[in-house]
Amino acid sequence: MRPMLPILALAAAAVPLAATAVARPETPKQALTAAIAAPTRTPTNVARDKYRHPAETLAFFGVKPSDTVVEVWPGGGWYTEILAPYLARTGTYYAAAPLPNGAKGVQALQARDAARYAKVRIAGFPAKPGDATVPDGGADVVLTFRNVHNWRFGGADQAQAMFDAMFRMLKPGGTLGVVEHRLPEVRDAAAEEKSGYLKESSVIGFATKAGFKLAGRSEVNANPRDTADWPQGVWTLPPSYRLGDTDRAKYAAIGESDRMTLRFVKPR
Protein backbone atom coordinates (compact mmCIF):
# COMPACT_ATOMS: atom_id res chain seq x y z
CA MET A 1 0.00 0.00 0.00
CA ARG A 2 2.90 2.38 0.62
CA PRO A 3 3.43 3.22 -3.11
CA MET A 4 -0.11 4.63 -3.20
CA LEU A 5 0.65 7.42 -0.72
CA PRO A 6 2.37 9.79 -3.18
CA ILE A 7 -0.50 9.33 -5.60
CA LEU A 8 -3.06 10.13 -2.91
CA ALA A 9 -1.04 13.16 -1.85
CA LEU A 10 -0.97 14.44 -5.42
CA ALA A 11 -4.71 13.91 -5.75
CA ALA A 12 -5.35 15.81 -2.52
CA ALA A 13 -3.12 18.66 -3.67
CA ALA A 14 -5.02 18.86 -6.94
CA VAL A 15 -8.35 19.55 -5.20
CA PRO A 16 -7.63 23.15 -4.17
CA LEU A 17 -6.12 23.80 -7.59
CA ALA A 18 -9.30 22.60 -9.27
CA ALA A 19 -11.41 24.65 -6.90
CA THR A 20 -9.31 27.71 -7.70
CA ALA A 21 -9.85 27.16 -11.42
CA VAL A 22 -13.62 26.91 -10.97
CA ALA A 23 -13.70 30.04 -8.82
CA ARG A 24 -11.79 32.17 -11.30
CA PRO A 25 -14.06 35.09 -12.30
CA GLU A 26 -15.40 35.34 -15.82
CA THR A 27 -13.92 37.86 -18.19
CA PRO A 28 -16.41 40.37 -19.68
CA LYS A 29 -16.19 38.50 -22.99
CA GLN A 30 -17.00 35.19 -21.30
CA ALA A 31 -19.92 36.73 -19.42
CA LEU A 32 -21.33 38.21 -22.62
CA THR A 33 -20.88 34.94 -24.50
CA ALA A 34 -22.75 33.13 -21.72
CA ALA A 35 -25.61 35.64 -21.78
CA ILE A 36 -25.98 35.31 -25.55
CA ALA A 37 -25.82 31.49 -25.39
CA ALA A 38 -28.33 31.22 -22.52
CA PRO A 39 -31.08 28.65 -23.17
CA THR A 40 -33.60 31.07 -21.66
CA ARG A 41 -33.48 33.34 -24.72
CA THR A 42 -36.51 33.22 -27.00
CA PRO A 43 -35.74 30.96 -29.99
CA THR A 44 -37.06 33.50 -32.52
CA ASN A 45 -34.70 36.07 -31.02
CA VAL A 46 -31.75 33.70 -31.21
CA ALA A 47 -32.52 33.11 -34.89
CA ARG A 48 -31.91 36.81 -35.55
CA ASP A 49 -28.39 36.85 -34.08
CA LYS A 50 -26.98 36.40 -37.59
CA TYR A 51 -28.48 39.77 -38.53
CA ARG A 52 -28.10 41.67 -35.25
CA HIS A 53 -24.63 40.46 -34.16
CA PRO A 54 -25.08 41.10 -30.42
CA ALA A 55 -21.59 40.02 -29.33
CA GLU A 56 -19.79 42.21 -31.86
CA THR A 57 -22.18 45.13 -31.40
CA LEU A 58 -21.96 45.26 -27.61
CA ALA A 59 -18.19 44.78 -27.74
CA PHE A 60 -17.93 47.72 -30.15
CA PHE A 61 -19.96 49.86 -27.75
CA GLY A 62 -17.67 48.78 -24.90
CA VAL A 63 -20.40 47.55 -22.56
CA LYS A 64 -18.91 46.07 -19.36
CA PRO A 65 -20.71 43.87 -16.79
CA SER A 66 -20.23 46.54 -14.11
CA ASP A 67 -21.77 49.36 -16.16
CA THR A 68 -25.02 51.19 -15.60
CA VAL A 69 -26.70 50.75 -18.98
CA VAL A 70 -29.87 52.40 -20.23
CA GLU A 71 -31.61 50.82 -23.19
CA VAL A 72 -33.91 53.41 -24.70
CA TRP A 73 -37.12 51.97 -26.13
CA PRO A 74 -36.32 48.26 -25.75
CA GLY A 75 -39.48 47.15 -27.57
CA GLY A 76 -40.12 43.45 -27.18
CA GLY A 77 -36.96 42.95 -25.15
CA TRP A 78 -34.65 41.46 -27.76
CA TYR A 79 -31.57 43.00 -26.15
CA THR A 80 -33.10 42.83 -22.67
CA GLU A 81 -32.72 39.05 -22.79
CA ILE A 82 -28.97 39.56 -23.17
CA LEU A 83 -28.23 42.74 -21.24
CA ALA A 84 -30.27 42.08 -18.09
CA PRO A 85 -28.44 38.86 -17.11
CA TYR A 86 -25.10 40.22 -18.34
CA LEU A 87 -25.40 43.21 -15.99
CA ALA A 88 -27.26 41.51 -13.14
CA ARG A 89 -24.29 40.70 -10.90
CA THR A 90 -22.35 43.98 -10.76
CA GLY A 91 -24.09 46.39 -13.13
CA THR A 92 -27.49 48.00 -13.61
CA TYR A 93 -29.91 47.72 -16.52
CA TYR A 94 -32.60 50.32 -17.17
CA ALA A 95 -35.36 49.81 -19.71
CA ALA A 96 -36.45 53.35 -20.60
CA ALA A 97 -39.62 53.77 -22.63
CA PRO A 98 -42.96 55.60 -22.75
CA LEU A 99 -45.03 54.15 -19.92
CA PRO A 100 -47.06 52.06 -19.60
CA ASN A 101 -47.19 50.59 -23.12
CA GLY A 102 -43.51 50.92 -23.99
CA ALA A 103 -42.45 48.60 -21.18
CA LYS A 104 -44.87 45.76 -21.91
CA GLY A 105 -42.28 43.64 -23.69
CA VAL A 106 -39.86 43.86 -20.76
CA GLN A 107 -42.63 43.26 -18.24
CA ALA A 108 -43.63 40.12 -20.15
CA LEU A 109 -40.08 38.84 -19.69
CA GLN A 110 -40.28 39.60 -15.97
CA ALA A 111 -43.57 37.72 -15.72
CA ARG A 112 -42.07 34.72 -17.52
CA ASP A 113 -38.85 34.57 -15.46
CA ALA A 114 -39.03 36.80 -12.40
CA ALA A 115 -35.67 35.71 -11.00
CA ARG A 116 -33.73 36.37 -14.19
CA TYR A 117 -35.17 39.85 -14.67
CA ALA A 118 -35.65 40.84 -11.03
CA LYS A 119 -33.05 43.61 -11.14
CA VAL A 120 -34.36 45.31 -14.29
CA ARG A 121 -35.31 48.92 -13.61
CA ILE A 122 -38.12 50.39 -15.71
CA ALA A 123 -38.10 54.13 -16.31
CA GLY A 124 -40.28 56.51 -18.26
CA PHE A 125 -38.74 58.00 -21.40
CA PRO A 126 -40.04 60.54 -22.12
CA ALA A 127 -41.16 60.61 -18.50
CA LYS A 128 -44.57 61.69 -17.26
CA PRO A 129 -45.21 63.01 -13.74
CA GLY A 130 -44.94 60.09 -11.35
CA ASP A 131 -42.77 57.93 -13.62
CA ALA A 132 -39.51 56.50 -12.35
CA THR A 133 -36.65 58.10 -14.26
CA VAL A 134 -33.00 57.58 -15.06
CA PRO A 135 -30.99 60.08 -12.97
CA ASP A 136 -29.19 62.74 -14.98
CA GLY A 137 -25.52 61.82 -15.23
CA GLY A 138 -26.17 58.32 -13.92
CA ALA A 139 -25.44 56.11 -16.94
CA ASP A 140 -22.16 54.74 -18.24
CA VAL A 141 -23.77 53.64 -21.50
CA VAL A 142 -27.00 54.51 -23.30
CA LEU A 143 -28.08 52.23 -26.13
CA THR A 144 -30.87 52.50 -28.68
CA PHE A 145 -31.50 50.00 -31.44
CA ARG A 146 -33.49 50.93 -34.56
CA ASN A 147 -35.53 53.66 -32.86
CA VAL A 148 -34.28 56.95 -34.28
CA HIS A 149 -36.52 56.63 -37.35
CA ASN A 150 -39.55 56.45 -35.04
CA TRP A 151 -38.52 59.69 -33.39
CA ARG A 152 -37.88 61.26 -36.78
CA PHE A 153 -41.45 60.43 -37.82
CA GLY A 154 -42.52 62.85 -35.08
CA GLY A 155 -40.38 65.56 -36.66
CA ALA A 156 -36.75 66.62 -36.47
CA ASP A 157 -37.41 68.56 -33.26
CA GLN A 158 -38.72 65.45 -31.51
CA ALA A 159 -35.71 63.41 -32.60
CA GLN A 160 -33.40 66.15 -31.38
CA ALA A 161 -35.15 66.26 -28.01
CA MET A 162 -34.53 62.54 -27.56
CA PHE A 163 -30.81 62.92 -28.24
CA ASP A 164 -30.67 65.89 -25.86
CA ALA A 165 -32.28 63.75 -23.15
CA MET A 166 -29.88 60.85 -23.74
CA PHE A 167 -26.98 63.27 -23.42
CA ARG A 168 -28.27 64.32 -19.98
CA MET A 169 -28.54 60.69 -18.85
CA LEU A 170 -24.86 59.97 -19.38
CA LYS A 171 -21.90 60.57 -17.13
CA PRO A 172 -19.11 62.69 -18.65
CA GLY A 173 -17.07 60.26 -20.72
CA GLY A 174 -20.08 57.97 -21.16
CA THR A 175 -21.02 56.21 -24.38
CA LEU A 176 -24.07 56.43 -26.61
CA GLY A 177 -24.50 53.46 -28.95
CA VAL A 178 -26.91 53.74 -31.88
CA VAL A 179 -27.95 51.13 -34.43
CA GLU A 180 -30.30 52.34 -37.18
CA HIS A 181 -31.56 51.39 -40.64
CA ARG A 182 -29.30 53.18 -43.14
CA LEU A 183 -30.39 55.28 -46.10
CA PRO A 184 -27.67 55.94 -48.71
CA GLU A 185 -26.37 59.50 -48.50
CA VAL A 186 -27.21 60.15 -52.17
CA ARG A 187 -30.94 59.59 -51.63
CA ASP A 188 -33.52 62.33 -51.29
CA ALA A 189 -33.84 63.28 -47.63
CA ALA A 190 -37.63 63.06 -48.02
CA ALA A 191 -37.27 59.26 -47.84
CA GLU A 192 -36.44 59.65 -44.15
CA GLU A 193 -40.01 60.78 -43.54
CA LYS A 194 -41.63 57.42 -44.26
CA SER A 195 -39.21 54.65 -45.26
CA GLY A 196 -37.82 53.76 -41.83
CA TYR A 197 -34.30 54.46 -43.13
CA LEU A 198 -32.13 57.43 -42.09
CA LYS A 199 -28.88 58.81 -43.42
CA GLU A 200 -25.85 58.41 -41.19
CA SER A 201 -25.26 62.13 -41.54
CA SER A 202 -28.71 62.84 -40.10
CA VAL A 203 -28.15 60.67 -37.02
CA ILE A 204 -24.69 62.11 -36.50
CA GLY A 205 -26.21 65.57 -36.83
CA PHE A 206 -28.74 64.95 -34.05
CA ALA A 207 -26.04 63.52 -31.79
CA THR A 208 -23.46 66.25 -32.34
CA LYS A 209 -26.06 68.99 -31.89
CA ALA A 210 -26.89 67.43 -28.51
CA GLY A 211 -23.21 67.68 -27.53
CA PHE A 212 -21.87 64.23 -28.40
CA LYS A 213 -18.61 63.50 -30.22
CA LEU A 214 -18.53 60.73 -32.82
CA ALA A 215 -16.07 58.13 -31.51
CA GLY A 216 -16.42 55.33 -34.02
CA ARG A 217 -18.33 53.61 -36.79
CA SER A 218 -18.70 49.88 -37.34
CA GLU A 219 -19.95 47.92 -40.34
CA VAL A 220 -20.80 44.88 -38.21
CA ASN A 221 -24.52 45.33 -38.98
CA ALA A 222 -24.10 46.28 -42.64
CA ASN A 223 -26.01 44.46 -45.38
CA PRO A 224 -24.92 45.41 -48.92
CA ARG A 225 -27.86 43.47 -50.40
CA ASP A 226 -30.30 46.01 -48.94
CA THR A 227 -30.89 48.82 -51.46
CA ALA A 228 -33.27 50.68 -49.11
CA ASP A 229 -35.85 51.35 -51.83
CA TRP A 230 -38.56 48.81 -51.09
CA PRO A 231 -42.31 49.29 -51.69
CA GLN A 232 -43.15 49.19 -47.97
CA GLY A 233 -39.92 50.70 -46.74
CA VAL A 234 -37.74 48.79 -44.33
CA TRP A 235 -40.76 46.74 -43.22
CA THR A 236 -40.74 44.99 -46.61
CA LEU A 237 -37.74 42.99 -45.39
CA PRO A 238 -37.62 40.38 -42.63
CA PRO A 239 -38.68 40.11 -39.92
CA SER A 240 -41.77 42.20 -40.83
CA TYR A 241 -42.48 40.95 -44.38
CA ARG A 242 -45.18 43.59 -44.80
CA LEU A 243 -46.01 42.32 -48.31
CA GLY A 244 -46.92 38.93 -46.88
CA ASP A 245 -46.17 36.11 -49.30
CA THR A 246 -45.48 38.44 -52.24
CA ASP A 247 -41.81 37.97 -53.22
CA ARG A 248 -41.15 36.56 -49.77
CA ALA A 249 -38.29 34.35 -50.93
CA LYS A 250 -36.64 37.35 -52.58
CA TYR A 251 -36.78 39.41 -49.40
CA ALA A 252 -35.70 36.49 -47.23
CA ALA A 253 -32.60 36.13 -49.42
CA ILE A 254 -31.79 39.82 -48.90
CA GLY A 255 -32.12 39.48 -45.13
CA GLU A 256 -32.65 42.19 -42.55
CA SER A 257 -31.82 45.82 -43.25
CA ASP A 258 -28.48 47.50 -43.80
CA ARG A 259 -27.68 49.26 -40.51
CA MET A 260 -25.32 51.91 -39.30
CA THR A 261 -23.61 51.23 -35.97
CA LEU A 262 -22.35 54.43 -34.37
CA ARG A 263 -20.55 55.07 -31.08
CA PHE A 264 -20.62 58.54 -29.53
CA VAL A 265 -19.09 59.87 -26.33
CA LYS A 266 -20.17 62.62 -23.97
CA PRO A 267 -17.13 64.88 -23.49
CA ARG A 268 -15.60 64.99 -20.02
What feature does the model see in each segment?
Residues 32-64:
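Class I SAM-dependent methyltransferase Rossmann-like catalytic core
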Residues 65-75:
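Conserved class I S-adenosyl-L-methionine
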Residues 84, 158-172:
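A short glycine-rich, Lys/Arg-flanked "PGG" loop and its adjoining helix->strand segment in the class I
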Residues 105-131:
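S-adenosyl-L-methionine
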Residues 132-142:
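A short acidic, Gly/Pro-enriched loop at the edge of an enzyme's catalytic core
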Residues 173-181:
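Conserved beta-strand signature within the Rossmann-like core of class I S-adenosyl-L-methionine
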Residues 189-217:
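Conserved Class I S-adenosyl-L-methionine
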Residues 247-268:
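C-terminal lobe and adjacent flexible extensions of AdoMet/dcAdoMet transferase-like proteins
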